[in-house]
């Protein structure tokens, strides 16, 4: 028996034994096994899909795209989130097993983007719905930026404690600017109280005597008929 056959015999014990904690071991095992959920609502998802190709090859980071939320532990909200899509997004997040992580990808996801000023159906920030771990700005972000966000998430996972993460999600939430619209009861379905908008009355709302009175005259707007 020589040292060539058994090279570990000449090594010191401190180089052969690893001392760690259960939390560190759990975090280390999750670093290279982040399985993202294939979720996209806008053009940002095209940039994320390009990572699957051989040019960027995100398989080297251990990322395996999954089509089921029950098999995924990472979701990248790529694209605009609307009021009608919000309940489905929350349901997908709730179906993901713990521990789970969220990356807000793109300006439309983070603040509403170009739709944040005059859109009545866009969520101004996905952090109103989900606890976000990493914010990735851009319109849209490049694939290199997505890889950088995943790298930062891996660093965050390596030093986190699972119990503290669950506690922070229940107490601490970060919100963006509130909506400037009056939200009705069914806000998750995109129905807003739009009573302040001017709406011309229909012909059925005009009394018959008023309608026939102005029928022979020149064209009159519906507002004039009511008044």
Curated annotation (Swiss-Prot):
How it assembles, according to the record, is: NDH is composed of at least 16 different subunits, 5 of which are encoded in the nucleus.
What's the protein called, per UniProt?
NAD(P)H-quinone oxidoreductase subunit K, chloroplastic
- GO process annotations (BP): aerobic respiration; electron transport coupled proton transport; photosynthesis, light reaction
Cofactor dependency? [4Fe-4S] cluster
What keywords does the record list, in alphabetical order? 4Fe-4S, Chloroplast, Iron, Iron-sulfur, Membrane, Metal-binding, NAD, NADP, Plastid, Plastoquinone, Quinone, Thylakoid, Translocase, Transport
InterPro entries xrefs = NADH_UbQ_OxRdtase-like_20kDa, NADH_UQ_OxRdtase_20Kd_su
Cofactor binding, per record: Binds 1 [4Fe-4S] cluster.
* Pfam families listed in its UniProt record: Oxidored_q6
Polar residues: which segments have biased composition?
A: 173-192
E.C. number? 7.1.1.-
Give residues annotated as binding [4Fe-4S] cluster.
Answer: 43-44, 108, 139
Molecular functions per Gene Ontology: 4 iron, 4 sulfur cluster binding; iron ion binding; NADH dehydrogenase (ubiquinone) activity; quinone binding
The job of this chain, per UniProt, is described as:
NDH shuttles electrons from NAD(P)H:plastoquinone, via FMN and iron-sulfur (Fe-S) centers, to quinones in the photosynthetic chain and possibly in a chloroplast respiratory chain. The immediate electron acceptor for the enzyme in this species is believed to be plastoquinone. Couples the redox reaction to proton translocation, and thus conserves the redox energy in a proton gradient.
Quick one: a GO cellular component term? respiratory chain complex I
Q: Where is this region: Disordered?
A: 173-201
Give the way it sits in the membrane.
Peripheral membrane protein
């Amino acid at each position: 028996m020589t040292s060539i056959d058994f090279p570990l015999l000449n090594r010191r014990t401190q180089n052969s034994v690893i001392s760690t904690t259960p939390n560190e071991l759990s975090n280390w095992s999750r670093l290279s096994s982040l399985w993202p959920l294939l979720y996209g609502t806008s053009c940002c998802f095209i940039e994320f899909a390009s990572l699957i190709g051989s040019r960027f090859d995100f398989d080297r980071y251990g990322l395996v795209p999954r089509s089921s939320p029950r098999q995924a532990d990472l979701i990248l909200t790529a694209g605009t989130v609307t009021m009608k899509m919000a309940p489905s997004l929350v349901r997908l997040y709730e179906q993901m097993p713990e521990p789970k992580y969220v990356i807000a990808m793109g300006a439309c996801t983070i603040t509403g983007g170009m739709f944040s000023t005059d859109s009545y159906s866009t969520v101004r920030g996905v952090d109103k719905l989900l606890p976000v771990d990493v914010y990735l700005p851009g319109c849209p972000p490049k694939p290199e930026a997505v890889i950088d966000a995943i790298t930062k998430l891996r660093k965050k996972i390596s030093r986190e404690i699972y119990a503290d993460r669950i506690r922070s999600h229940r107490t601490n939430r970060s919100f963006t600017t509130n909506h400037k619209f009056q939200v009705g009861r069914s806000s998750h379905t995109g129905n807003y109280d739009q009573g302040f908008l001017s709406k011309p009355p229909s012909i059925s709302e005009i009394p018959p005597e008023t309608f026939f009175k102005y029928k022979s005259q020149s064209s009159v707007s519906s507002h004039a008929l009511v008044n």
